[in-house]
Amino acid sequence: MPRVIHFEIHAQAPERAVKFYRDLFGWEFTKWPGPQDYWLIKTGPDGQPGINGGLIQRRGAGPTGELPVIGYVCTIDVPALDDYVKKALTGGGTLAVPKMAIPSVGWLAYCKDTEGNIFGMMQADPKAA
């Protein structure tokens, strides 16, 4: 069956978004040498489960608070959800959905990045209730 192999973040201010995600998750960004502003994103070591992605200049207006999510929301596995939510807020992000328990799975929260994009963060915890 087909699998997701790549994700893409659209940004009004790409440099600001690169800094946000680099500081928050330690992701590596490499400017693509092609004709458009595009950054390749490496989210972890080769051989570790997960996918890599890209970041591109947004074409058109950014999302507003009144719009529902249009597109897919990526959720990032983190070791300490509370710490990462604090890092996201300190880095210029905002809280979209507060921390909640997913029983027997873990803890989940949703944030918005500096560009208004929503992303999830989850801490595995089989005792979450």
Where are these regions (language model features)?
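N-terminal beta-strand motif that seeds the catalytic metal site of vicinal oxygen chelate
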Residues: 1-19, 71-76, 123-129
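Core segments of cupin and vicinal oxygen chelate
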Residues: 2, 8-50, 90
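Conserved hydrophobic/aromatic beta-strand scaffold that supports enzyme active sites
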Residues: 38-40, 75, 108-110
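Mid-chain, well-packed structural core segment of small domains
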Residues: 63-93
